[in-house]
Swiss-Prot record:
Record-listed E.C. numbers: 6.3.5.-
Entry's localization field: Mitochondrion inner membrane
Name this polypeptide is given: Glutamyl-tRNA(Gln) amidotransferase subunit F, mitochondrial
Biological source species: Debaryomyces hansenii (strain ATCC 36239 / CBS 767 / BCRC 21394 / JCM 1990 / NBRC 0083 / IGC 2968)
Keyword Protein biosynthesis: yes
Chief location category: mitochondrion
GO molecular function: ATP binding; glutaminyl-tRNA synthase (glutamine-hydrolyzing) activity
Length: 183
């Protein structure tokens, strides 16, 4: 009898398993009614403080001083003759940006909830993803430079006329010199 059992072919089974991974995160305050949603959608600018919860201890733990700001301004070709209040404002802004970048890379791990583990890879094959971009010509490049001032995007935090090229450091020989018509 045992010989017979050994001779019975075993059934081969195949299975197909799919799984999904879900993440949950809270971004900003909870919206409770239609008017709050409409206000959020119609708001063209935003603030890091509105989105990310952080403590002042986190801000204090980031080591940035006026020397760092001065080096950054010099490396950028900008004038580094700022008042102490302006430097403090730039230091705080840079610290908030570093907190925001850390949040983007690491996420708020306390708010992410992994529903199910998965090692599935998701990809898409769409022709438009693989089309070569339109080549840049001198004419299109020059026209885009002329229209640069009109292409300010408030959603990206860009402010119209926020960079005055006449305030660039014209005495910096290692980078560039900008002369304005005001001189």
């Amino acid at each position: 009898m045992s010989r017979m059992l050994n001779q019975i072919p075993r059934l081969i089974t195949r299975s197909f398993r799919t799984s999904s991974v879900g993440y949950k995160a809270t971004l900003g305050p909870i919206l409770e009614n239609k008017s709050q949603i409409q206000d959020l959608v119609n708001k063209s600018e935003w603030n890091i403080v509105d989105i990310i919860k952080f403590s002042e201890d986190e801000v204090r733990n980031i080591k940035i001083d006026s020397r760092v700001i001065t080096k950054m301004l010099r490396a950028s070709g900008l004038k580094d003759s700022l008042s102490e209040d302006q430097k403090k404002s730039l230091i705080r802004g840079l610290k908030l940006q570093m907190i925001f970048i850390k949040y983007l890379y690491e996420g708020d791990e306390a708010e992410f909830h992994k529903i199910e583990e998965s090692n599935d890879d998701v990809f898409r094959l769409i022709l438009s993803d693989h089309k070569a971009p339109k080549p840049i010509t001198l004419k299109s490049l020059l026209s885009s430079i002329e229209n640069l001032e009109n292409e300010v995007d408030a959603e990206k935090g860009e402010i119209k006329s926020s960079l005055d090229i006449s305030k660039l450091n014209g005495n910096n020989p290692t980078y560039f010199t900008v002369r304005s018509n005001k001189e």
